[in-house]
């Protein structure tokens, strides 16, 4: 067994089980640095085990479908139903069988600082990705519920021509009129890894669009609020009026459109 604290730390990094004999051997080492390293590694392993358990639970829908013979399960989710401005964006993602991506979760539960990293991990591992975007004008024409469906259908259509085609759809709280077997899952982005993958792809895609709109239409805080009705956004509406990306069927934009004193 290594004796220097530096060597012990290096040995601990290779340990992946809480039952490893090295932990028991080091428990009798009275040096503060050793005990600190020991507890740190044990905590890290516990964190990894908890993450593995969480990911395994989020594969329950997929594993049940694999047992039934389905091979290419697509997760589908959308982002942007509630904002006053910008599009609704949906993504359709097919991950390899039993694929686990550390940190992947409902995009609302992932710290913003980690969005890009997990998004890139999904892009690297996914067998196929489709993205559907429905702009504010069509949202106003058909309503946000129907626009969400259209975005999801467009995301599925974007898979055409890719090597992997879906034989089953797991959809976040929605049923689609399409000839592919499917299941609607309430809070699917928190209960299915495939849907969670679609959630982060849709989220990052839309956030990038809104950051670009923030440069085109400054004063509304689009890069920070993604078009939601924050205080800064509402103040921008009062100060500068409605932009071409605002949803005129959503309040308070709708009332501003009816007010002849506003553009």
UniProtKB/Swiss-Prot annotation:
The keyword Cytoplasm applies. One of its GO terms (biological process) is DNA replication, removal of RNA primer. Its cofactor is Mn(2+); Mg(2+). The keyword Calcium does not apply. It is found in: Cytoplasm. It is an enzyme of class 3 (hydrolase). This is Ribonuclease HII. It comes from Streptococcus pyogenes serotype M4 (strain MGAS10750).
């Amino acid at each position: 067994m290594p004796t220097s604290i530096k060597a012990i730390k290096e040995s601990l990094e290779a340990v992946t089980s809480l039952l490893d004999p090295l932990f028991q051997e080091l428990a009798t080492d009275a040096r503060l640095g050793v005990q600190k390293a020991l507890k740190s590694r044990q905590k890290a392993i516990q964190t990894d085990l908890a993450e593995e358990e969480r990911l395994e639970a989020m594969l329950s829908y997929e594993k049940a479908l694999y047992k039934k013979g389905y091979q290419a399960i697509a997760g589908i989710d959308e982002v942007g139903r509630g904002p006053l401005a910008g599009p609704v964006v949906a993504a359709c993602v097919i991950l390899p069988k039993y694929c686990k991506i550390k940190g992947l979760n409902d995009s609302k539960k992932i710290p913003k600082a980690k969005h890009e990293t997990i998004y890139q991990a999904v892009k690297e591992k996914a067998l196929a990705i489709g993205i559907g975007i429905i702009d504010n004008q069509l949202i106003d024409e058909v309503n946000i519920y129907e626009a969400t469906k259209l975005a999801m259908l467009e995301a599925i259509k974007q898979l055409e021509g890719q090597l992997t085609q879906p034989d089953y759809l797991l959809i976040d709280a929605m049923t689609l009129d399409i000839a592919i077997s499917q299941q609607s899952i309430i809070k699917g982005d928190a209960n299915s890894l495939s849907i969670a993958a679609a959630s982060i792809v849709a989220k990052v895609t839309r956030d990038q669009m809104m950051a670009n709109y923030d440069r085109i239409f400054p004063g509304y805080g689009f890069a920070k609020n993604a078009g939601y009705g924050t205080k800064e956004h509402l103040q921008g509406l009062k100060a500068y009026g409605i932009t071409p990306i605002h949803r005129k069927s959503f309040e308070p934009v709708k009332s501003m459109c009816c007010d002849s004193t506003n553009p």
